[in-house]
Amino acid sequence: ADGFDQLIDLTAVDYLTYAGERTLPGGLTPERFEVVTSLINHVRRERIRIRTQVSADEPTIPSLFDLWPGSEYLEREAFDMFGITFADHPDMSRVLMPEDWVGHPLRKDYAVGAIPVQFKAASNER
């Protein structure tokens, strides 16, 4: 953690349909998924963004919960939306979608429109 005392954000990206070239440092191989973590060190007034490559074959990485308990909801959201599992997370369960929901809606290969959703009409009264 090297003095980075606050987790600012954690999110994920699915590069399945990305046609551009992704350049990573140190000869790292780009994977389908990337978990992006933003941290801050208040004493040194520094910020850091960590990009972690996650394999599509086994989309699992270690949880940050022991270092930054504030990651609990953010990791659950990444699991719910992208299907990325955070090993040793205290409650790796859905947080936005119903528990019986099939699939992960922010994956690029998710079947859009496969499940009809009835939206409530907006009222004309103001």
What feature does the model see in each segment?
Residues 1-126:
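Terminal low-complexity/charged segments
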